[in-house]
Swiss-Prot record:
It comes from Halalkalibacterium halodurans (strain ATCC BAA-125 / DSM 18197 / FERM 7344 / JCM 9153 / C-125) (Bacillus halodurans). InterPro entries: 3-IsopropMal_deHydase_ssu (IPR004431), Aconitase/3IPM_dehydase_swvl (IPR015928), AconitaseA/IPMdHydase_ssu_swvl (IPR000573), IPMI_Swivel (IPR033940), LeuD (IPR050075). Disulfide bonds: none annotated. It comes from the Bacteria. The keyword Ion transport does not apply. The gene is leuD. This is 3-isopropylmalate dehydratase small subunit.
């Protein structure tokens, strides 16, 4: 995985609550086993009209949101089934950070495992960000090392994160990568057991 220490990007506002994994990546697109290629199907039923054209009313289809790399959403984001395809689609679409007041537990952990930083902020902070980025391009800097979210206009917030996941993201490790750091010790242990 690519290390994530600090990320600066434009926000894309999805002012909806209880966005479930079926809405993030609909079931008909779950036939792939590799982690790439899912971004084109992100929020498919909302992003596109039945004829396949972009839905002009969908938040992420607005010109200022199309280049967003930080998704700002409502509470309980990622609820529903535990499919890992949901964070795969979010990352493949181009988001590195998701900010919300709360996340479904499995989705929250799957984000870390796939190199996405899920940031829990207070509801009033998320509401303020949504107002700032609803109709215009709005840039944020998320500093994982300092655990802060800031902008040039003075917005500041802090967030909590488990030390394990923080270290994993900062170093760009997934769980296999973490294990491989101890490859020599594992080999020595295995050799001693023969």
């Amino acid at each position: 995985m690519e290390p994530l220490k600090t990320h600066t990007g434009t926000i894309a506002v999805l002012d909806r609550v209880n966005v479930d994994t079926d809405q993030i990546i609909p079931k008909q697109f779950l036939k792939r086993v590799e982690r790439t290629g899912f971004g084109q199907f992100l929020f498919f039923d909302w992003r596109f009209l039945p004829n396949g054209e972009d839905n002009p009313d969908f938040e992420l289809n607005q010109p200022h949101a199309k280049q967003g790399t930080i998704l700002v959403a409502g509470h309980n984001f990622g609820c529903g089934s535990s499919r890992e395809h949901a964070p795969w689609a979010i990352k493949d679409y181009g988001f590195r950070v998701v900010i919300a007041p709360s996340f479904a537990d499995i989705f929250y952990n799957n984000c870390f495992k796939n190199g996405i930083l899920p940031v829990k902020l207070k509801q009033e902070e998320v509401t303020a960000l949504m107002e700032k980025g609803k109709d215009t391009a709005y840039s944020l800097t998320v500093n994982l090392e300092a655990q802060t979210v800031t902008s040039e206009d003075g917005f500041e917030a802090t967030f909590e994160i488990d030390g394990y996941w923080k270290e994993m993201l900062i170093n760009g490790w997934d769980e296999i990568g973490l294990t491989l750091r101890y490859e020599e010790q594992i080999k020595q242990f295995e050799a001693s057991r023969v």
